[in-house]
Amino acid sequence: MIARSELKKELINAGIRPSVQRLAIYEYVKSHHTHPTADVVYDALRDVLGSLSLTTVYNTLKLFVDAGLVQLLTIDDTFRCFDGDTTSHAHFRCDSCGRIVDLKIKSDFLAMVDGLGGFEIKEAQLYLKGICPICKRKN
């Protein structure tokens, strides 16, 4: 778990004022590797932060995404979640249980894409879908 003082520094370095709510939301996303949705973050923090609204959570997460502190994952059109790990990695979503797992990328997967000459790539995300080992064993 990252120290709260370190998280506060990260917000300040990104030009974000570290209010109590912002710091709590950032700490939650960085420390929970479950790829939470905005609703999950809100449900987890609303009792701790009495004045927290769902709108505040959405706006704060957007602020973090825009600052490059958090990744927005849009694995399909209906599901949006957040990842506090901004390093290069892939995501696997189980079609059965819905769990999202981080996967290491052994090489530059963009090198496998033909025709990128002249393009400036600002972001690339690799999503894999299928059945996870746990669900596969159950069936």
Regions found by a protein language model. Give the residues of each.
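Short capping segments at the starts of secondary-structure elements
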Residues: 18-20, 32-37
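Non-DNA-binding regulatory cores of transcription-related proteins
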Residues: 66-139
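Short, Lys/Arg-enriched N-terminal segment that forms or immediately precedes the first helix
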Residues: 2-15
